[in-house]
Amino acid sequence: MKLPMIDQLEKLTGHYFKDKKKLKKALTHSSVQGSEQGNYERLEFLGDRVLGLLIAEMLYQLFPQASEGELSVRLNSLVNAQTCADIALEMELPVMIHVGFEMKNLKGRRLTNMYADVIEALIAVIYLDGGLESVRPFIQRYWQSRAKQMDAGRRDAKTQLQEWAHVQGGVQPHYRVVKRSGPDHDPVFMVEVSIPGFASEIGQGNSKRCAERMAAEKILRREGIWETMEKNNHE
């Protein structure tokens, strides 16, 4: 790895890298053939756990009144692939990633996942270099402002309910129309949303989408997710 690139990464992360070989590995995709130093997959595995721990710690400190459910939703939003990929782009990491020829034209979700994997691998290298105390400033630098700005209580209710349901046990909300009434030009839909292990709720609206959103909002409020988020966002 060229010295200017290492210098740039050290400025971006605020960390002096002791193990340059691991740093190179963190930026190498498995599609690179004959790579002696290996690829980032094992580092990504470790970095994912370190990121989750430090984000959980940060949220616990930032939102002392938040319920476990709210913290889980916020955690999921901050460690998901899209957020990590956004940070990779902010750091201009994509130009530093080594990939095989067949991966040069990667697009969409697979590209997002690769960027996220590299961020997590980079976190692992910092952790192996200096432990949690070395990683914490990096996490605070790129994630803390996102955590503070996140108005989770006002995000799309269906998306938030899906995230909340996932952290409850990997389940998904199921929506079904239970009734449709009114004329074609002014219909009224009643939609039931159910989640395994929880009581269902029914929402009403002039479209299926609106009724689904209303039903999702009812569960979020009933379970205390929106209530605590709204309280925290006004403090």
From Swiss-Prot:
It comes from the Bacteria. GO terms for biological process: mRNA processing; regulation of gene expression; rRNA processing; tRNA processing. Keywords: Cytoplasm, Endonuclease, Hydrolase, Magnesium, Metal-binding, mRNA processing, Nuclease, RNA-binding, rRNA processing, rRNA-binding, tRNA processing. Its EC number is 3.1.26.3. SMART domains: DSRM, RIBOc. One of its GO terms (molecular function) is metal ion binding. The keyword Nuclease applies. Belongs to the ribonuclease III family. Digests double-stranded RNA. Involved in the processing of primary rRNA transcript to yield the immediate precursors to the large and small rRNAs (23S and 16S). Processes some mRNAs, and tRNAs when they are encoded in the rRNA operon. Processes pre-crRNA and tracrRNA of type II CRISPR loci if present in the organism. NCBIfam families: RNaseIII (TIGR02191). This is Ribonuclease 3. It comes from Bartonella henselae (strain ATCC 49882 / DSM 28221 / CCUG 30454 / Houston 1). The gene is rnc.
